[in-house]
């Protein structure tokens, strides 16, 4: 990894913050349905669930796609941005999952448009994000990758920040819905740190292949996300 400046670190901490007003806290990505069906009942089963989603979903599809989007933004390749944005939306195989990424993408675009992120030079990219919002939809990783490119954040550090935000949100959902205590939740998050590093390395390998190797094999995760749409009592929107 390249050296990270203080300014770059602050930008990544800002984007990865749970205080970022994009609504990530309101989604569990199927975890709540897994709890409802008795698959996740304690810290141990929560760790297994999140670790599997990280290794077989995030590392194989979402993270390499994020890298491809980050590289496309840096290269000014609008065609590639559009292609990988559509690819990511298509990879969300339930109504709630698609609604999640589109809502969060819209919210991040609105935020970036309202604050001086990246300075005046960022204005053309804001317009490109707006065109996606008005067109086929803006996926959240597309907007996040654009924000990272605007401040020239190193892609490995930026992907780690993106992944940590995803991981922290999953643990927060487990704390609320299992439920787990705060100490148990932090212990769970700490135990997953090494797996996040492995996921970033796997994503880098997959994104660098020709063609990029993108796949997910999480049928139970997909079924539970679809079942969540009809779950009677729930805290989360996915």
Swiss-Prot record:
UreD, UreF and UreG form a complex that acts as a GTP-hydrolysis-dependent molecular chaperone, activating the urease apoprotein by helping to assemble the nickel containing metallocenter of UreC. The UreE protein probably delivers the nickel. This is Urease accessory protein UreF. GO terms for cellular component: cytoplasm. It comes from the Bacteria. Keywords: Chaperone, Cytoplasm, Nickel insertion. Transmembrane segments: none annotated. Gene3D superfamilies: Urease accessory protein UreF. Required for maturation of urease via the functional incorporation of the urease nickel metallocenter. HAMAP family: UreF (MF_01385).
